[in-house]
Design a protein with these regions (language model features):
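ATP-dependent helicase/translocase motor core
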Residues: 1-181, 190-206, 227-231, 249-251, ...
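Conserved RecA-like ASCE P-loop NTPase motor core of nucleic-acid helicases/translocases
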Residues: 154-156, 180-188, 409-417
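Conserved RecA-like ASCE ATPase "motif II neighborhood" in helicase/translocase motors
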Residues: 228-283
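Interdomain helical connector at the RecA1-RecA2 junction of SF1/SF2 helicase-like NTPases
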Residues: 306-408, 425, 429
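Conserved motor-coupling elements within RecA-like helicase/translocase cores
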Residues: 214-232, 245-249, 447
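Conserved helicase ATPase motor motifs in RecA-like P-loop NTPase domains
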Residues: 158, 260, 281-304
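Conserved helicase motor "Helicase C" RecA-like lobe of SF1/SF2 P-loop NTPases
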Residues: 418-443
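Structural recognition of the conserved hydrophobic beta-strand(s) that form the central parallel beta-sheet
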Residues: 58-60, 232-234, 254-255, 292-297
Length: 447
């Protein structure tokens, strides 16, 4: 070792040092939980062998108590705010809540075994909201597999670690349901790639390598080639209409990401062709009739939208934006309405409203085709020179009068399309040439 150190508390499990505490006095103004974090980093440098078997770290000044891993930055150390999974009394995180919530014997063993994983080089400890929600989801899925197949809806707001919660869930499912086959469904290729990438980074934790289905035929081959195990990723669009059942097995669990968008179960008559068109949700359920379905979403489901609840069952757990911001899991978002006066006639306004209605519904193929025919007209309106000029003048005015000397950081202007983004960029530089080093255009991979 590099020197002699004496940590405040070390928790041993069968003789192995699995948790290290660093405590600071709440009565001393010069020390706090941040000082405890720096002390822990110092220990890792000076006495590294102590951390070979380390599961996680705890830093506390009694007023603030947080847990994290050896790879986590200070901002990723999180409070453990409940002993039983309730969100009712989580405004303040008490030291005894962390101790009783994490260090009850069975729970500590459960956390070490099932709720710590490596994602690439990062060692990740589940937050309290992830731990209790995933445990609830497992119980809900086991019950659904023996009844109606409706595992429920898992709503954790965007940015709070929903993708990792899905990884923890998939890991636990293997033992809880005797190695079922898991089919993960998204409604966009880019989301499929993102979620697949997250799972692929955790193959050691999952004890298997996820695969992506390239087509309905490929999906059938992947399902037919096994009687258990497997994590298969696919998009809803690959479930093209067919009367063929892909698999009648009961030990299949379907995880639908952003479940509210593409999992409606319905059939409609196309007024143009007279054909009955089935929703993706209906096709999927006819293709996997005996599977158990669980929906994951980061977006509030409208009180008017009963379809998602009817398809998946009741909420398993709700971790909303308010709770996530209070916990520091996500940043707060504030909305301020801005009105740009444009000269649009009533027909144009009606057309825009209709298109937003289409986009707000599930992305069925026939709805997309109808929408495409009108989008060109909307782009010509939103991309008109007078529209862009009015928008950019308002942005410049708002920045210089209200934000320039008040905030640091970055701002994002999200455009309707790539050509419109370029017009906004050029117009901003025409108005403020000195912003040349401050303004850039960033293109997304898909549009």
């Amino acid at each position: 070792e590099n020197s002699t150190k004496r940590p405040d508390i070390v928790v041993f499990l069968n003789g192995l040092p699995v948790v290290v505490f660093e405590l600071k006095s709440p009565s001393r103004e010069e020390t706090d939980a941040s000082e405890a974090y720096l002390q822990l980093r110092n220990y890792m440098h000076e006495i590294p062998s102590l951390f070979i078997y380390n599961a996680f770290l705890v830093m506390s000044d009694l007023a603030n108590s947080k847990a994290g891993t050896i790879t986590a930055g200070e901002d990723r150390f999180m409070e453990w705010k409940t002993k039983d999974g309730s969100y009712e009394n989580t405004k303040y995180a008490q030291f005894d809540t962390l101790i009783e919530g994490m260090f009850e014997k069975a729970r500590l063993l459960d956390i070490i075994k099932n709720f710590i994983c490596f994602s690439g080089d990062a060692k990740i400890l589940a937050g309290y909201h992830q731990y209790f929600a995933v445990r609830k989801a497992i119980e809900s899925t086991k019950k659904a597999a023996n009844t109606d197949g409706k595992g429920g809806v898992f709503w954790h707001t965007q940015g709070s670690g929903k993708s990792l919660s899905m990884v923890f869930y998939a890991h636990l499912l293997q033992e809880a349901m005797s190695s079922p086959t898991i089919v993960v469904i998204t409604d966009r290729n880019d989301l499929d790639d993102q979620l697949f990438s997250q799972f692929a980074k955790c193959t050691g934790f999952l004890r298997q390598t996820p695969v992506q289905a390239e087509s309905r035929k490929h999906l059938k081959e992947l399902l037919a080639g096994r009687q258990a195990n497997g994590i298969i990723f696919t998009t809803a669009q690959k479930f093209e209409e067919s009367d063929e059942v892909l698999s009648g097995r009961r030990n299949i669990v379907v995880m639908a990401d952003e479940a509210h968008r593409s999992q409606y179960v319905e059939a409609k008559v196309d007024t143009e062709t007279g054909r009955v068109r089935k929703s993706f949700g209906l096709i999927i359920r006819e293709s996997l009739p005996n599977a158990t379905y669980i929906g994951f979403t980061g977006t509030p489901i409208s009180s008017k939208d009963r379809s998602t609840i009817e398809v998946f069952g009741d909420y398993i757990d709700i971790y909303d934006m308010t709770q996530a911001v209070e916990d520091g899991a996500t940043r707060p978002v504030y909305y301020e309405s801005r009105v740009i006066h444009l000269k649009l006639n009533e027909d144009v306004l009606r057309m825009i409203d209709e298109e937003y209605d289409v986009l707000a519904q599930n992305a069925e193929a026939y709805a997309i085709e109808k929408s495409k025919r009108e989008l060109g007209r909307i782009e010509s309106i939103l991309g008109a020179e007078e529209t862009i000029t009015a928008l950019c003048e308002d942005i410049v005015r708002h920045y210089e009068e209200n934000r320039q000397y008040e905030l640091t950081g970055k701002a994002m202007i999200v455009a309707y399309s790539r050509p419109i983004a370029m017009r906004i960029y050029r117009t901003l530089l025409q108005l403020r040439p000195e912003w040349n080093e401050k303004v850039r255009v960033v293109m997304t991979e898909s549009n």
